């Protein structure tokens, strides 16, 4: 019997039954336990949610900036009060350790909501003088109803990253979480309602991307789609959104990010960064630095330091506070990652550690894969070219700065990049040549609310977080005012 009651859709400020009559299972990837039956939205439910959002958006947009700001700040307070219970639910649903969800997922999501709540009164237009008798002013107006489509690795954080700027700008949002991890997005909807958000301004539709996601991207009542997920799916979403009604899109997609260690680097720091950039969240982070470039002269020393740290990783029950490495999100994803590991072996990469499923005792019930490090990798290997989205580090050896920059950029992706060096002149010089939207110097992975997040090339379109993102959720109206006479040519 499932641990939780059957999960309904959230439309118009309340839970409602899906008209499809169908459900799917939410599975705990650490144990195989069915957490809940989750209702599958139908196309009629999408229509119902869009209609509810359109009505709610009118009420929301008519409120003053300070009224909207206070409601979102109240939601921030509730999120922080319920941090621990939300973190436990996120851990059950994703398999991520409590040591992570308790201090990152809800905390950073609430930070983003607080950031945008504070910016609401600053959404303003311009006044442009033309001549003594005439001027132009601009208004930043909300788009209306927008859709957010989330990924399974950071469910509530992504829901907050997408909804915070959208709601701050006066829009309503219909959010579709990944069918793999749907539970905390529904809790977020409850919190928004409790905080005073008008009915319909934040709706949650659960179901598959192939169905619900596509219906949202095609719906004529939706003005924008913000999607987080894989590049292949992102291309489909973008094509559907543009062909249906020229919707605006924001895409945060895949990555195969380079981490470059230079010969003057503090090797202990470099190894710490490399391990964090590959094994945090069991490697299921889009910005992970999975291509680790190391100077030939440092290869043996660097590998030894990485191995020392990987052996300290505490794989275990994600509900145990001592655990810092949990299972992958699902059995299907585990099989995908194991397939890539086998590819690495068959294509000639040298395995330093890991490379197997962990199936001793109770671990056999879960989707556990050991932290894996390959070295002597080549740029043409599958594990180097394709996004694995799992705990697999590829070490590549280089001989010159010019060479490593060229090879680091030799990818279809451009989400993130980083360098480790004591020479800040070199750090900035190299970073400015790397084709990536998010870059780190002597660190990795932090994405504060103030920092725009997004990729180059096939890693995305537009940005999330930061001041710039508010512009993605408004449209500019230009108004000319003439105070003097008017002369017709006719």
Swiss-Prot record:
Assigned EC number: 1.2.1.8
Annotated binding of K(+) 2, by residue: 246, 457, 460
Cofactors (names): K(+)
Catalytic site: 162, 252, 286, 464
Disulfide bonds: none
A single MF term (Gene Ontology): metal ion binding
Pathway: Amine and polyamine biosynthesis; betaine biosynthesis via choline pathway; betaine from betaine aldehyde: step 1/1
Residues binding NAD(+), per UniProt: 150-152, 176-179, 230-233, 254, 286, 387
UniProt catalytic activity: betaine aldehyde + NAD(+) + H2O = glycine betaine + NADH + 2 H(+)
PROSITE patterns: ALDEHYDE_DEHYDR_CYS, ALDEHYDE_DEHYDR_GLU
Binding-site list for K(+) 1: 26-27, 93, 180
Keywords for this protein: Metal-binding, NAD, NADP, Oxidation, Oxidoreductase, Potassium
Positions where Cysteine sulfenic acid (-SOH) occurs in the chain: 286
Quaternary structure annotation from Swiss-Prot or TrEMBL: Dimer of dimers.
Function, as annotated: Involved in the biosynthesis of the osmoprotectant glycine betaine. Catalyzes the irreversible oxidation of betaine aldehyde to the corresponding acid.
Name the UniProt record assigns to this protein: Betaine aldehyde dehydrogenase
Organism: Ectopseudomonas mendocina (strain ymp)
Lineage, broadest ranks: Bacteria, Pseudomonadati, Pseudomonadota, Gammaproteobacteria, Pseudomonadales
Designated gene of the protein: betB
């Amino acid at each position: 019997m499932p641990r939780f009651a059957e999960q309904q859709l959230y439309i118009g400020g309340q839970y409602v039954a899906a008209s499809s009559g169908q459900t799917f299972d939410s599975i705990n990837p650490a144990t195989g336990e069915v957490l809940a039956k989750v209702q599958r939205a139908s196309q009629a439910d999408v229509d119902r949610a869009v209609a509810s959002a359109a009505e709610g958006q009118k009420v929301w947009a008519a409120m003053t900036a300070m009224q909207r700001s206070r409601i979102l700040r109240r939601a921030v307070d509730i999120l922080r009060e319920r941090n621990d219970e939300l973190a436990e639910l996120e851990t059950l649903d994703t398999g991520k350790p409590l040591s992570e969800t308790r201090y990152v997922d809800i905390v950073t999501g609430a930070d983003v909501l607080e950031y945008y709540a504070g910016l609401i009164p600053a959404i303003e237009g311009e006044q442009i003088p033309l001549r003594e008798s005439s001027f132009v002013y601009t208004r930043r107006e909300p788009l209306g109803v927008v859709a957010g489509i989330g990924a399974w690795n950071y469910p509530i954080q992504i829901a907050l990253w997408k909804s915070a700027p959208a709601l701050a700008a006066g829009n309503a949002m219909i959010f579709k979480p990944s069918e793999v991890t749907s539970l905390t997005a529904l809790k977020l909807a409850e919190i928004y309602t409790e905080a005073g958000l008008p009915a319909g301004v934040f709706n949650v539709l659960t179901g598959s991307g192939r169905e619900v996601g596509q219906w949202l991207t095609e719906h004529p009542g939706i003005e924008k789609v913000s999607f987080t997920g894989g590049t292949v799916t992102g291309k489909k979403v973008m094509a559907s959104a543009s062909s249906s009604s020229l919707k605006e899109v924001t895409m945060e997609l895949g990555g195969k990010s380079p981490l470059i260690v230079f010969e003057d680097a503090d090797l202990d720091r470099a190894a710490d960064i490399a391990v964090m950039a590959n094994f945090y969240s069991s490697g299921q982070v889009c910005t992970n630095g999975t291509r680790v470039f190391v100077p030939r002269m440092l290869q043996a020393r660097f590998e030894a330091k990485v191995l020392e740290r990987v052996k300290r990783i505490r794989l275990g029950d994600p509900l145990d506070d001592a655990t810092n490495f949990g299972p992958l999100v699902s059995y299907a994803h585990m099989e995908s990652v194991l397939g890539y590991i086998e590819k690495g072996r068959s294509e000639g990469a040298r395995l330093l550690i890991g490379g197997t499923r962990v199936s001793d005792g109770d671990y056999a019930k879960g989707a556990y894969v050991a932290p894996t490090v390959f070295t002597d990798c080549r740029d043409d290997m599958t594990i180097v070219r394709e996004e694995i989205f799992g705990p697999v580090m590829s070490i590549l050896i280089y001989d010159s700065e010019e060479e490593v920059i060229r090879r680091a950029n030799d990818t279809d992706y451009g989400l993130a990049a980083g360098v480790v060096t004591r020479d800040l002149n070199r750090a900035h010089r190299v970073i400015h040549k790397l084709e990536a939207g998010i870059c780190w110097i002597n660190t990795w992975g932090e994405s504060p609310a103030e920092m725009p997040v997004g990729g180059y090339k096939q890693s995305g379109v537009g940005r999330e977080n930061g001041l710039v993102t508010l512009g993605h959720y408004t449209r500019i109206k230009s108004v000319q005012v003439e105070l003097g006479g008017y002369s017709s040519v006719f």
